[in-house]
Amino acid sequence: MEWIQAAILGIVQGLTEFLPISSSAHIFIVGKLMGLGDPGAAFTAVSQLGTEAAVIVFFWRDIVRIIKHWGLSIAGKIPRNDPDARMGWLVVAGSIPIIVVGLFFQNAIEVTFRNLWIVATTLIVFGVILAVADAVGKHERKLEELTVKHGILYGLAQCLALIPGVSRSGGTITAGLLMGYTREAAARYSFLLAIPAVLGSGFYELFKIVAKHENAGDTFNLGQTALATVIAFVVGYLIIGWFLKFISHNSYRGFVWYRIALGLVVFVLLGFGVIPATLS
């Protein structure tokens, strides 16, 4: 991998992480079009630290308040039904499914699903599901109305993001819409819920690479990955603000059509042998 290619992948990561179009799918596809080997699950996980840092900076006031009140509720100094403390508990509850599924299906995640036929299929299928959710959802519930049950359902939907092409934000936002939440509420909880999962995955992959030299992929380079991570942070920060404003006045229809079109393009490229199906 050249430095310019790492920079391009960083831009792609930042542009796509928070949109319901799957950042991992775009990293795979763009990497293949540039003639790269598989950057690996490690590259994706570590570069996502940049976009997750963007979430933390963008929502830092909310996050600090949530953590503070959550800690006070644990100490018994404020009731657990305090709005911010409650959100902290909801993020914890929603994170349980991804921890369990990630631990038990790590090999399948890192090997079996890294195939462009799967990516193209999930882009289209989950694009259609997002369209249905956006059309039939009531768009009435606010973030303050989130329940533990719904938080766990969000968490189960987040597990689908372990399959390349589904999209972490796409899966959780779809779940939120189906449960009747507004587009903005669904997106905000999706972003907050992703923080523990992405940080945990990213730092774990980084530890394996630095300490154990595992799972580095064909083209992994720590310096280049660091560059991609920084670029992903800057671009991702800009995208968050734009996305939240956009969905407050628009539907997800444009993202749905984009997913379907991209999936079809990948099928065509695979069918004509322009790019290989396997990511190795």
UniProtKB/Swiss-Prot annotation:
Additional information: Bacitracin is thought to be involved in the inhibition of peptidoglycan synthesis by sequestering undecaprenyl diphosphate, thereby reducing the pool of lipid carrier available.
GO CC aspect terms: plasma membrane
The protein's name: Undecaprenyl-diphosphatase
UniProt keyword Flavoprotein, yes or no: no
Record membrane topology: Multi-pass membrane protein
Classification via Pfam families: BacA
Function: Catalyzes the dephosphorylation of undecaprenyl diphosphate (UPP). Confers resistance to bacitracin.
Organism: Renibacterium salmoninarum (strain ATCC 33209 / DSM 20767 / JCM 11484 / NBRC 15589 / NCIMB 2235)
GO molecular-function term, one example from the UniProt record: undecaprenyl-diphosphatase activity
EC numbers for this chain: 3.6.1.27
Keywords: Antibiotic resistance, Cell membrane, Cell shape, Cell wall biogenesis/degradation, Hydrolase, Membrane, Peptidoglycan synthesis, Transmembrane, Transmembrane helix
